[in-house]
Every structure is written in structure tokens, then in C-alpha cells.
């Protein structure tokens, strides 16, 4: 997408042919800053500290982390150690596991002398596939927005999104935002309500920043505003991304998504989830009890970053000293509250049957594996 009118991706191989460039998302929206990753540990740290974040981008970064690891040591033991180190960085995002499994499988049949080249090639392939997948998600989702506009052509289509499932969460385009960008570029008038998404404020810091750079009309709202907007007919469509979807359609996404889905269900607002097929965990059915929910540090809740009147970036405490804090990174929205899924293969119901209809090979393969695991 565009930054100051220049097309950018979120991750790339630098001109030296081996170091990996990223946008440091911890500096946004106050500073656009890039970073250079040169080792396995730097890639792992970028994921853990959320310099890169969003399930698809985490998967791509981890793949490049494996490639960086192979530069230092391409032995079988090093492959397993790099895989395990990166897998431990963010437990909720299934794309991380998927990308690492793909690299490990490729490297397991590649001679050590060729593993560096092969790892970079596979990581680049995953990145390019992500761009095409997000573009396809955008095309399918745009038709939902087009349909809403045809029903009421005299005003913009009002959308609500939570967290950041945008360009910054993928290599390009985004998942939840891809339909919005394509609709905007096609001349369909849209307006986006952007949840601030505490405690890390990915909506206020990231989604609003990227929408603004692309020229998409938007309004940032406090997290608890969505229900009020829906009650008063100010939201035509809620669309979010996801870090993991189970085989039966339960959705893990940034904390607060479940509450938005409840409000949408109560007010009759369509609630769609945009995702690539790689985000589906075909071996898991019950998301509420089966998806591991990441807990993060207290300081994300007790402190907040902002810019002072004289331009300084400061972090200040907002919670009374001594107050205990709980910081759950994600929640799970049951499939019954989700209108449907927007995927690279089209739209489907939020159900086991709906997902299996779009991804029959994966569904059949995982069903066989579950039977084998239960035997």
C-alpha cells in the first residue's frame, strides 16, 4: 500500500540479498521507521515485541527467520532449534506454525549446503502468495460492500473494524482492509469506524494511519463505542481479521472482538471475518476451550505511549500504583455469532460445512488425521 504516495510492503529482502527489512510498527503512527533483521534472534525479537504483528506477517517473518538461521548454521539440529525458537514467540497465531512447518518440511529434504538458498526462496514464495491471497480476499469482499452501496447509493457504506487486519498485518493489502481499499479505489464511497483497540491501540495507531495514507475516510472511536453505533444504524458491516479459525468456524482475534460480535448479533449488523486459508486450524474444533490465549505484560495496560505538545514521544502510566493487571491478548468468537468468512476462494458460512466446501482437500486430510490421533 502507499506511504506518502510511495508503494510499500511490510517486509522485504534488502539490497545486500540476505538481510530482511521490516517496518518497525512499534514506532507508528508518530514515526515511520524501518529495521534490518540479520539473525534468528532478531527475527524472533521482532515478532515477540510486535515490531511485526498480524498473523500472516508473523508467518512470513518467521519463514525469513528460518532463512537467517540457516546462514549461521544449516545443520539438522539448527533447523529444529530455529523452528522451536520461532514457534514459541506468539502462541495464538496459526500462520506462525504453518509457515514454520512449511520451511521445516522443505529444509528436511534439502542438503545442508543448499539450505540457505532454498530457505530464502521458500520464504519469498510465502510472501508472494500472501499478497495474491489478500488481493483475492479483497475482490470477494468488495462485492459485499458493492451490494450494500447499491441498496443505499446516496451515502457512504459505513464499516466497523477492530484491531489492525490491514496492510500492516500482512505483506500487502491486508485481510479485513483489502475489500475496503478495493472498494475505495473503485469509487465506492466508504467510511470506516476504527476501534482504538486497547491496550496496544493497534486501531488508533496502525489502522487509522494506513487508511489515512491511502485516503480512505475514517473515524477513530473508543473501544466501547461500537454497540452504540450499531444500535443507531451507523454501521452497515463489521469486518475483522483473525489469528486462528477452527475447523468448525470459531474465531480467535484481538481481545474485544467477541463483544463486537455480540453487539452485531443483537442489532442485526452483518459480522464478517476475513482470512487466508492458512489461518484455519483444521485439527481444532472447539475454539473457546482449545485455542491458547496469549497473555502479555502488565505494562501494556498500565502505560500508554503518546506525543506531547512539543513533539516528544513519551510513555506514561495510567493505572494506580499497586493495582493488579490482567492482559489477555485475544478472545474467541463462537461461529454462531459470525455471519460468514471472506477467503481467497470466496465467501462461505461460518461453519464446518462452509469451510470444508471451500477447502475440501484440507478438510478431508485433517479429518483423517483427527481419526488417526484418536485411535
Swiss-Prot record:
Substrate binds at residues 53-55, 90, 202, 253-254. InterPro entries: IF-2B-related, IF-M1Pi, IF_2B-like_C, Initiation_fac_2B_a/b/d, M1Pi_N, NagB/RpiA_transferase-like. The active site is at 243 (proton donor). Keywords: Amino-acid biosynthesis, Isomerase, Methionine biosynthesis. Pathway: Amino-acid biosynthesis; L-methionine biosynthesis via salvage pathway; L-methionine from S-methyl-5-thio-alpha-D-ribose 1-phosphate: step 1/6. It catalyses: 5-(methylsulfanyl)-alpha-D-ribose 1-phosphate = 5-(methylsulfanyl)-D-ribulose 1-phosphate. The keyword Cell membrane does not apply. Signal peptide: none annotated. GO terms for biological process: L-methionine salvage from methylthioadenosine. The keyword Amino-acid biosynthesis applies. It comes from the Bacteria. It holds the Pfam family IF-2B. Its EC number is 5.3.1.23. Belongs to the eIF-2B alpha/beta/delta subunits family. MtnA subfamily. Catalyzes the interconversion of methylthioribose-1-phosphate (MTR-1-P) into methylthioribulose-1-phosphate (MTRu-1-P). This is Methylthioribose-1-phosphate isomerase. It comes from Rhodospirillum centenum (strain ATCC 51521 / SW). The gene is mtnA.
Amino acid at each position: 500500500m502507499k506511504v506518502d504516495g510511495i508503494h510499500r510492503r511490510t517486509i522485504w529482502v534488502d539490497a545486500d540479498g540476505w538481510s530482511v527489512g521490516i517496518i518497525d510498527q512499534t514506532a507508528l503512527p508518530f514515526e515511520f521507521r524501518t529495521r534490518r533483521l540479520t539473525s534468528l534472534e532478531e527475527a524472533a525479537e521482532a515478532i515477540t515485541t510486535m515490531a511485526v504483528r498480524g498473523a500472516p506477517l508473523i508467518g512470513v517473518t518467521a519463514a525469513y527467520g528460518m532463512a537467517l538461521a540457516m546462514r549461521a548454521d544449516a545443520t539438522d539440529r539448527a533447523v529444529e532449534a530455529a523452528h522451536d525458537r520461532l514457534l514459541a514467540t506468539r502462541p495464538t497465531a496459526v500462520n506462525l506454525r504453518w509457515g514454520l512447518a512449511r520451511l521445516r518440511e522443505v529444509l528436511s529434504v534439502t542438503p545442508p549446503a543448499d539450505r540457505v538458498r532454498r530457505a530464502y526462496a521458500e520464504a519469498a514464495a510465502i510472501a508472494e502468495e500472501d499478497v495474491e491471497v489478500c488481493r483475492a480476499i479483497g475482490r470477494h469482499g468488495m462485492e459485499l460492500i458493492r451490494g450494500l452501496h447499491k441498496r443505499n447509493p446516496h451515502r457512504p457504506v459505513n464499516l466497523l473494524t477492530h484491531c489492525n487486519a490491514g496492510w500492516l498485518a500482512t505483506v500487502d493489502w491486508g485481510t479485513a482492509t483489502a475489500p475496503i481499499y478495493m472498494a475505495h479505489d473503485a469509487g465506492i464511497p466508504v467510511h470506516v469506524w476504527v476501534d482504538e483497540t486497547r491496550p496496544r491501540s493497534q486501531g488508533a495507531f496502525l489502522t487509522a494511519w494506513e487508511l489515512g495514507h491511502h485516503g480512505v475516510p475514517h473515524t477513530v472511536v473508543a473501544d466501547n463505542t461500537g454497540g452504540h453505533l450499531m444500535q443507531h444504524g451507523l454501521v452497515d458491516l463489521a469486518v475483522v481479521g483473525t489469528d486462528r479459525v477452527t475447523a468448525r468456524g470459531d474465531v480467535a482475534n484481538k481481545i474485544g472482538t467477541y463483544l463486537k460480535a455480540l453487539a452485531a448479533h443483537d442489532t442485526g449488523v452483518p459480522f464478517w471475518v476475513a482470512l487466508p486459508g492458512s489461518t484455519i486450524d483444521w485439527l481444532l474444533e472447539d475454539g473457546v476451550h482449545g485455542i491458547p490465549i496469549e497473555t502479555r505484560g502488565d505494562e501494556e495496560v498500565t502505560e500508554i505511549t503518546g506525543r506531547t505538545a512539543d513533539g516528544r514521544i513519551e510513555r506514561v502510566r495510567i493505572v494506580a500504583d499497586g493495582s493488579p493487571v490482567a492482559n489477555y491478548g485475544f478472545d474467541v468468537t463462537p461461529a454462531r455469532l459470525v455471519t460468514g468468512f471472506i477467503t481467497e476462494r470466496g465467501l462461505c458460512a461460518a461453519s464446518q460445512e462452509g469451510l470444508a466446501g471451500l477447502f475440501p482437500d484440507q478438510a478431508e486430510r485433517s479429518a483423517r488425521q483427527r481419526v488417526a490421533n484418536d485411535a
